A protein has these predicted regions:
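Cytosolic regulatory regions of ion transport systems
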Residues: 1-236
Length: 236
């Protein structure tokens, strides 16, 4: 069983912790707020209230076999925590940062991965502003993303094979969501219906071109232009 520690229960730390608690992992918690720690005490392997963090304290709290640490603290505390975790040779040290500059600092002191929650949230939300068919959007890596889209009118009544998604739109259909909200794989013979919602993977620009294939709203061209400018800025 993997062992993961969450140092700091800010919004990001709590969100990660709640996801971890739903998995088959052993979780360790450290925070200076007793009330925050007590809320998860019974669900974790070890929950500690600690004002001052140092190498020796961490050594006592965390097992030598710890697999990863997630750090969500104030800047100075996060720098120290990342440095201490590096000294303890923890293989994976993930730190939340608010800027690229802080991310570089965290990397220098020992973080193996830096995450930017606000930046990632912006990447997910902004595309939704420009298309009525784009329901959700998740960047994966580089220019690759996964998007939940209403099937455009031009494909309704066609089979998956006839749609030629890869050839025409350079996209892959991962699955189709049914009326019960369940996703299922569909064969090449599947016929697209009016209310179908698909989960697609592909290049950001290709996904967003596909997202505006169907709508015939006023300002259609202006929306496309604005959206593509956004994508170009993000890729630059």
């Amino acid at each position: 069983m993997k062992q993961i520690a969450v140092l700091g229960l800010g919004y990001f730390g709590k969100s990660i912790l709640e996801e971890l608690l739903s998995l088959n992992v052993e979780v360790f918690i450290v925070d200076r707020d007793k009330e925050a720690v007590d809320a998860y005490r019974e669900l974790s392997s070890n929950s500690v209230v600690m004002d001052i963090l140092n190498v020796e304290n961490l050594r006592k709290i965390l097992p030598e076999t710890i697999d990863a640490v997630i750090i969500d603290m104030g800047v100075e505390a996060a720098i120290l925590a990342a440095s201490y975790c590096a000294k303890l040779n923890i293989p994976t040290i993930i730190v939340k940062a608010e800027s690229e500059t802080l991310g570089e600092i965290f990397t220098l002191v020992g973080a193996t991965k830096v995450v930017f929650p606000n930046k990632e949230a912006a990447k997910r939300v902004t595309p939704l502003l420009f298309s009525s068919t784009l329901l959700s959007y998740m960047p994966v890596s580089g220019a690759l993303s996964i998007a939940e889209l209403k099937i455009p009118d031009v494909l309704i009544g066609k089979t998956l094979a006839e749609s030629k998604l890869r050839e025409k739109y350079r996209l892959n259909l991962v699955s189709i969501r049914d009326q019960n909200g369940e996703y299922a794989l569909c064969p090449a013979s599947y016929v697209f219906n009016e209310n179908d919602i698909g989960l697609f993977s592909g290049n950001d620009a290709d996904l967003n071109k596909f997202a505006v294939v169907a709508p015939k709203e006023s300002g259609y061209n202006r929306i496309i232009e604005k959206f593509m400018r956004f994508i170009k800025r993000k890729d630059s």
